Amino acid sequence: MKYLGAYLLATLGGNASPSAQDVLKVLEAGGLDCDMENANSVVDALKGKTISEVIAQGKVKLSSVPSGGSAPAAAAPSGGAAPKAEEKKKEEPKEESDDDMGFGLFD
């Protein structure tokens, strides 16, 4: 994936047909480890294709991947209902207002 990204960055940078060496330069500039064999395979696979074609093919492939399962079915209600626990209302002490403490933000 990083080789594909580097290839696309080189293409966006103005290089219409990046070589494996160009891909490696982009990756090294980002501080990433590089493998010439992987760079060559990506360049060979993308040779003669435009960015638009690569993105369109990627969209087609991503649309065929399932993106999640169906929602789980709701559980059937049990025979007896448990009594609801009474909610206790806590009275929270009112906090003192910090509106005027004798000084302003822009004084």
Curated annotation (Swiss-Prot):
Residues 84-93 have a biased composition (Basic and acidic residues). The keyword Nucleus does not apply. Residues 63-107 are annotated as: Disordered. One of its GO terms (biological process) is cytoplasmic translational elongation. Belongs to the eukaryotic ribosomal protein P1/P2 family. P1 and P2 exist as dimers at the large ribosomal subunit. This is Large ribosomal subunit protein P2. It comes from Caenorhabditis elegans.
